[in-house]
Amino acid sequence: MSKETKLQVEAIKNGTVIDHIPAKVGIKVLKLFDMHNSTQRVTIGLNLPSSALGSKDLLKIENVFISEAQASKLALYAPHATVNQIENYEVVKKLALQLPERINNVFACPNSNCISHNEPVESSFKLSEKNNDIRLKCKYCEKVFARDVVTEIEA
């Protein structure tokens, strides 16, 4: 007996679809863009089956279009995610995610002795990637941290 089943998430008319987010990262992305406080409808798929990733997260945000700058921040969490802008149920633009060279005023430095904690300065990290391993170097204390160490502080 062969029974075909297909999981579906409702299509959105206008907005942004972020697909291929690594599993367990979708909630962090929601918080990064403050979407958990949005008045717009947000559809969240967590731990969905994925042939490429094994499992993945998916976000659909109605009537919200993320910018190229926001897409760069997203690349820090999900460098291989796809971001589609939807208008009238059609994909009108695909944003290519590119890891930014530097990220400012998003995360605090994990080094408690860093001057960025006691001085009125914006946090600033230089980003680098090698073999899918993302590292952040603090502009002030010059310590290098794994992505997970820096991003877990705010999440």
UniProtKB/Swiss-Prot annotation:
Keywords attached to this Swiss-Prot or TrEMBL record, sorted alphabetically, are: Metal-binding, Pyrimidine biosynthesis, Zinc
Record note on cofactor: Binds 1 zinc ion per subunit.
| Positions contributing to Zn(2+) binding | 109, 114, 138, 141
Q: What are the recorded GO MF terms, alphabetically?
A: metal ion binding
- Annotated GO CC locations: aspartate carbamoyltransferase complex
Output the GO biological process annotations, alphabetical, semicolon-separated.
'de novo' pyrimidine nucleobase biosynthetic process; pyrimidine nucleotide biosynthetic process
Gene3D superfamilies membership:
Aspartate carbamoyltransferase regulatory subunit, C-terminal domain (2.30.30.20), Aspartate carbamoyltransferase regulatory subunit, N-terminal domain (3.30.70.140)
**Which residue ranges does UniProt annotate as crossing the membrane?**
none
The cofactor required is: Zn(2+)
What is its quaternary makeup?
Contains catalytic and regulatory chains.
Q: Which family does it belong to?
A: Belongs to the PyrI family.
Task of the protein? Involved in allosteric regulation of aspartate carbamoyltransferase.
* Protein name from the UniProt record: Aspartate carbamoyltransferase regulatory chain
